[in-house]
């Protein structure tokens, strides 16, 4: 995440939305949360987070591309997509994950999309609004 932001010429303070990879597994989700906490600090609790894989299922190698499309649309429409089927939040992961779409406001947008694949393939893209 740090490398993606650095390559984008951005800082953690500019991020307005996170599309988490969110595997919905106890090990995977807590690991991603700890990574987010390490990068964003306590500010991560104020950033709207989506987990769009819940809407599509796991598409193996295609998952990251589709999650990036969700993130592009979130930035374009200034609206973080909902995390569907979320009925019970993990108390160990106190993120701002919504079951409803979350408005992102009128300010320039910068979102990241995490994709953590099988075998340790990890990628993150930073997507900035055109008005930035």
Predicted region positions:
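Conserved "HGTGT" condensation-loop signature of ketosynthase/thiolase-family condensing enzymes
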Residues: 1-132
């Amino acid at each position: 995440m740090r490398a993606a932001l650095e390559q984008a010429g951005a800082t953690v303070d500019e991020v307005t939305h996170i599309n988490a990879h969110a595997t919905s597994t106890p090990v995977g989700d807590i690991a991603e949360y700890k990574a987010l906490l390490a990068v964003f600090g306590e500010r991560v609790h104020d950033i709207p987070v989506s987990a769009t894989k819940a809407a599509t299922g796991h598409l193996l190698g295609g998952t990251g591309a589709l999650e990036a499309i969700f993130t592009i649309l979130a930035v374009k429409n200034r609206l973080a997509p909902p995390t569907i089927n979320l009925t019970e939040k993990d108390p160990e992961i106190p993120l701002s994950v919504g079951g409803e779409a979350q408005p992102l406001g009128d300010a320039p947008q910068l979102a990241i999309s995490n994709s953590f694949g099988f075998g340790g393939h990890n990628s993150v893209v930073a997507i900035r609004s055109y008005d930035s």
